Every structure is written in structure tokens, then in C-alpha cells.
């Protein structure tokens, strides 16, 4: 039993070394812009992917987010490993107000039906 606890602590310490600390708090329904480092030929550049977070999976350094956007009338989804060295930046553009953990129902919707209400901070309303 003691060896198992020790092994879990070792795994946690290794994962903690690979985790990024400068990431914003991300929730399902948020509108985000993810900067991804891509290599074209000999050059490396940052490509932005902007869309709605429709799912979050796993925890720790294995956390992934699924981001969906509509490009030229076609739905495009990408799964990003949040703590990957290929991810340059993640910006939350707008907070979304949703009541589901997974927004897969957005795949079946078109146009204005895919809109998500913006979350308003209760702190601002009381001031």
C-alpha cells in the first residue's frame, strides 16, 4: 500500500514539471483563440484557431479541449492537448453560459442556432 502511494506521488511530481502555469481558466461554452506552433518547411510560425470549447477531457497534464468553429459553411473541430509544447497561447475571448458538460448537440445545428449566450459576472451586476 505504501509503495502505491509513493508511485502516485512520483507520477504527480513528473506531471507537475510538464504542466503550464500561465493558462487561463477554461470552461465548456467559452469562445477561445488557441495559438498553435506549426512548422512549414524550415520556418516555424503560430497559427490561430478560434472557436467554441465543446468538450473537456482528462485532467492534469493530459487535459484536452475540443474546439469547434464553422469555416466556409463546414464545421471544423480540433482536439488540443492543453499542456502541449506545441500550444503557444490560449486566450478566452468570451465566457459562455451553458448547462452541459459536453456540447455535442451543436454539431447538428446550423447558423444562428449554434450561438451561446454570454455569461455575465454577478459581481458586476451588484455594483
UniProtKB/Swiss-Prot annotation:
Domain of life: Bacteria
The keyword Ribonucleoprotein is assigned to this record: yes
Keyword set includes Ribonucleoprotein: yes
InterPro entries on file: Ribosomal_bL19, Ribosomal_bL19_CS, Ribosomal_bL19_sf, Translation_prot_SH3-like_sf
Any single GO BP term: translation
Keywords, comma-separated and alphabetical: Ribonucleoprotein, Ribosomal protein
Cellular component aspect of the GO annotation: cytosolic large ribosomal subunit
Function: This protein is located at the 30S-50S ribosomal subunit interface and may play a role in the structure and function of the aminoacyl-tRNA binding site.
Family (UniProt): Belongs to the bacterial ribosomal protein bL19 family.
PANTHER family: LARGE RIBOSOMAL SUBUNIT PROTEIN BL19M, RIBOSOMAL PROTEIN L19
HAMAP family reported for this sequence: Ribosomal_bL19
Stated name of the protein: Large ribosomal subunit protein bL19
Organism: Synechococcus sp. (strain JA-3-3Ab) (Cyanobacteria bacterium Yellowstone A-Prime)
